[in-house]
C-alpha cells in the first residue's frame, strides 16, 4: 500500500536494474565460460513472478529469449486501484500490448523466441489469474503473436504444489530432459 507513483517508480527501477545491470552481467559471466554458455536468457516466474517475467520478456525480447509464466496477473489495475500513468501502463502487459503496433520490430523477436509459455490452473484462487491469462492470450493473438497457453484442470490451485509440477513439465519441454 501507499501512494501509487512511488510504488510504480520502484517497480520501474527494479525492471531497469534487471534489464540494464543484472542480465548483462549474467550474460557476461556466461560468455567467460566459453561458447557453450552464450545466448539469451529465458525468464520465468509463478504468481507475481509470472507477471514480472512476461513484462520483462515483452518489454525486452532483445535480452530475453522467452518466458515460462505460471498463474500470472498481466494487468496492473489490481495493484493500483484505478490509478494509471506512464509507468503503470509500461508495466501492464494487457494494456501496452493492446496498443502494440503491427510494424514494431519486437514482433519479429517474439516470433523467434524459444518459448513463450503461459500456464494457469482452473482451481482454487486461480479465477482472476485465468481471466488475465486468457485476456493477454487474446490480445497477443489479435497481434499475430502466438504464445503457448496451457490451461490445467479444475483441481489445479494457485499453489506451490502445482507450480513444482508445472516447472518440471515446462522446463523439460523447453530444455529437454536431463
Regions found by a protein language model. Give the residues of each.
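Non-catalytic cap/lid and distal C-terminal segments of serine-dependent acyl enzymes
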Residues: 1-178
Amino acid at each position: 500500500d501507499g501512494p501509487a507513483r512511488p510504488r510504480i517508480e520502484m517497480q520501474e527501477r527494479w525492471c531497469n536494474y534487471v534489464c540494464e545491470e543484472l542480465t548483462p552481467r549474467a550474460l557476461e559471466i556466461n560468455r567467460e565460460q566459453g561458447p557453450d554458455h552464450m545466448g539469451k536468457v529465458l525468464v520465468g516466474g509463478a504468481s507475481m513472478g509470472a507477471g514480472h517475467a512476461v513484462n520483462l520478456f515483452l518489454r525486452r525480447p532483445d535480452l530475453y529469449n522467452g518466458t515460462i509464466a505460471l498463474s500470472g496477473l498481466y494487468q496492473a489495475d489490481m495493484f493500483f486501484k484505478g490509478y494509471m500513468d506512464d509507468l503503470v501502463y509500461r508495466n501492464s502487459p494487457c494494456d501496452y500490448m493492446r496498443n502494440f503496433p503491427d510494424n514494431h520490430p519486437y514482433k519479429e523477436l517474439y516470433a523467434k523466441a524459444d518459448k513463450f509459455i503461459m500456464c494457469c490452473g482452473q482451481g482454487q484462487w486461480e479465477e482472476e489469474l485465468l481471466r488475465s491469462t486468457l485476456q493477454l492470450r487474446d490480445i497477443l493473438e489479435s497481434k499475430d503473436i502466438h504464445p503457448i497457453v496451457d490451461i490445467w484442470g479444475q483441481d489445479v490451485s494457485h499453489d506451490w504444489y502445482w507450480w513444482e509440477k508445472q516447472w518440471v513439465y515446462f522446463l523439460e519441454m523447453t530444455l529437454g530432459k536431463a
